[in-house]
Structure formats: structure tokens, C-alpha cells
Amino acid sequence: LKRYCADFETTTDPNDCRVWLWCTINIDDLSERHYGTDIASFFAWLPTKGLTEIYFHNLKFDGQFLLWYLLHETDFAYDEKGGEHSFHTLIGDSGIFYMIEMVLAKKHKNVDKIKFLDSYKKLPFTVKKIAKDFGIEESKGEIDYTKKRPLGYEPDANEMEYVTNDVLIVCKALRQQFEQDLTKMTISSDGLNFAKGQIGKKRWQALFPGAGCIDR
């Protein structure tokens, strides 16, 4: 299992809406960092072996760019059954994004896949607040979102630091959660799992025989 945090910086022009900078950092090895200046290079970077989880802080936003690229620039087919070389989503009726999953390859019980997840479901706060509340030394910076960034634009040092800190802050907070065995998809699922652990599996089933909870 490889786990990363990621962030897209995008243009604000509705007639030219695209990724102009992205960053990924390995949650378990913060020295592993990757950058690019368009979404094509992001997809080219994606790991192809084993299970990879990639957290975006607000998947509903970044996920729209992922889905657009999958639908328009790749030959991946949508398949809720998770067939080889396909993708599927977990999106609530109200439009809440929980997961986008790409299945790259299958061989017997071995599956190579990528799960795009929403760190906001585990850390429902702004990046600035996360840094403060978790005692993280990096702080959220500022950039000019309205600045013109044409195709081929090269990010400056401040913009690189901005995207790095945004990703690094969430990485460090998630790592603290993972070290406490808070590894579920959402904060509520983490709470449920903790309660089950405190009560015990047998007693939980006796107390709530018809709960039928989805353990995510």
C-alpha cells in the first residue's frame, strides 16, 4: 500500500479551466515529492502496481478534473463492477464525493488499482486550521488566484512553496491519524470502528444485531 496526498492548482477562467500545477507527497515518506504543470503529467506519474491511495482535500473539486480526464483523454471505461482497465465512483445522492477508483489490472487475486479519496472527510477543517490544531510547523501561504497563467506557465518559488505546504500539512495530519489506527474512509467510520474495538465484536453484535453498517 502506498499513500499520498495531492493537490491541484487550477486556473479560474471559465473558458480556460485547467490544472496549472500539481503536487503529491508520500504520507509515509515525506521526502518523496512529485510535481507537474498539467493534468496529463499527473496521470503519467500515477503508480501502476499494487494499491495506491491518493487523498485530495476536497475531492468534489479536484475529482471533477480527474473524471473529465478519465472520460475524455483515456480509454478507461466506467464499470461499477470494477473490471480491468476501468473506473468507478462513490458519490452520494447529494453530490458528495467519497471515492474515485481506477482499476488498472487484475491477475487472479492481485489487483493494481488507485483510490482517490477525500481527506476532508477525515479532517473536516481548512488547511490553515489543520496546521494550527495539529501543531504542524508549516503554514498555509497565499498566491494570486486571478493571475494569468497561460499554457506553458512556469510556477514561481512562492507558488511551489504554497502547493507544497498545502499538501505537506494534510500529509502530516493524516499520518498522525494513521498512527492511531484511524484508517477508515471518513471520520464517522473511524469513530464507529473505535467504538466497536472498545465494546468488542461479540458484544457489539449482541447489542446491535441489525445495524448493517457499511464498514468503510
Pin down the residues of each PLM region.
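Short, surface-exposed beta-edge/turn micro-motifs
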Residues: 1, 18-20, 51-52
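Common nucleic-acid-contacting/processivity interface regions adjacent to the catalytic cores
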Residues: 14, 149, 153-216
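Two-metal-ion RNase H-like nuclease active-site motif
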Residues: 2-12
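Conserved DEDDh/DEDDy metal-dependent 3′-5′ exonuclease domain
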Residues: 29-155, 161-165
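Short, conserved beta-strand segments within well-ordered enzyme catalytic domains
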Residues: 5, 23, 54-55
